[in-house]
Regions:
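Metal-dependent phosphoester-hydrolase catalytic domains
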Residues: 116-118, 137, 141, 148-158, ...
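N-terminal, active-site-proximal structural segment of metallo-dependent hydrolase catalytic domains
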Residues: 1-65, 239-241
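Active-site metal-binding loops of divalent metal-dependent hydrolases
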Residues: 8, 54, 129-131, 162-163, ...
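Structured beta-strand-rich core segments of catalytic domains in phosphoester-bond hydrolases
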Residues: 48-127, 131, 210-216
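Surface-exposed cleft-lining segments at the edges of enzyme active sites
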Residues: 21-27, 129-139
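Soluble or luminal CAZymes and related metallo-dependent hydrolases
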Residues: 28-37, 54, 85, 106-109, ...
Length: 241
């Protein structure tokens, strides 16, 4: 089962001051950015897709592009402390050929989308998260909440998304007992190299680490290649038969 998570960069967060020296025709061309993102998603053809920073119009376009192949959650708009009127949010896709529709339930949470489903007749909890970007204490509180509501017994777990916390082996977010952290590669290329997006799993067979994507050294090249300031993270996992 191929799992992908990606912060695709909402247009509402794109400002010239955030990307100094970059041609504005590149960063503000939302149509071209979305076309590039859609092409990458089709090429990867993941079984589970978890996106962050999806704008309402992009959500409608994604449903048109992928609705025949995936069950798609509603858009969970995120509310940030410094912007109560944000429009973008998280969306989770489950491939129709692998997940029975009548077993899928989506629950909006402050930090994203919580999904319950069956995969190969076994229960699976999937968290598509975009953790707080201002307060480590709030991130840990959100982390504690998702673990409090997840099913513990005989349930496989996937936690993926934008953690807004740089990867460190001993960090609580990446060092949860029983969970395997799959990404060791940089996922954000503005200002400096950072690994802040990841996929964690529990209950699955041990899987190889996520392969590193091409990392841009120029912001403009990154926008042209990915359409976002984040890189996608992909891992392949399977359950114990």
């Amino acid at each position: 089962m191929k799992v992908l998570t990606w912060n695709i960069l909402a247009a509402e967060w794109v400002k010239k001051s955030y990307y100094p020296g970059v041609d504005t025709s590149v960063i503000f061309d939302n149509k071209a950015r979305f076309a590039r993102i859609g092409k990458i998603l089709k090429q990867i053809d993941a079984d589970i897709i978890m996106l962050q920073e999806v704008m309402p119009q992009e959500y409608l376009n994604l449903v048109l592009l992928f609705g025949d192949k995936y069950f798609i959650s509603e858009l969970k708009t995120m509310v940030w402390g410094y912007n109560k009127n944000s429009e973008s949010g998280n969306v989770t896709f489950l491939k129709r050929s692998l997940f029975p529709k009548n077993t899928i339930s989506h629950y909006p949470r402050e930090y994203g989308v919580y999904t319950r489903c069956l995969y190969k007749n076994k229960p699976c909890d999937i968290f598509n998260v975009h953790l707080d970007d201002q307060s480590p204490q709030k991130r840990y509180k959100q982390w504690d909440d998702l673990h409090a509501i997840s099913r513990k017994k005989d349930c496989n777990n996937i936690i993926a998304g934008d953690f807004n916390q740089e990867y460190k082996k001993k960090c609580k977010l990446y060092n949860t007992p029983g969970f395997e952290t799959h990404n060791m590669c940089p996922t954000y290329y503005i200002e400096r190299k950072m690994n802040i997006d990841n996929i964690l799993t529990k209950g699955f067979q041990k899987a190889p680490l996520s392969k590193c994507n091409w990392y841009p050294t120029r912001i403009e090249d990154g926008f042209k290649e990915y359409g976002s300031d984040h890189l996608p993270v992909i891992v392949e996992v399977d359950i114990h038969e």
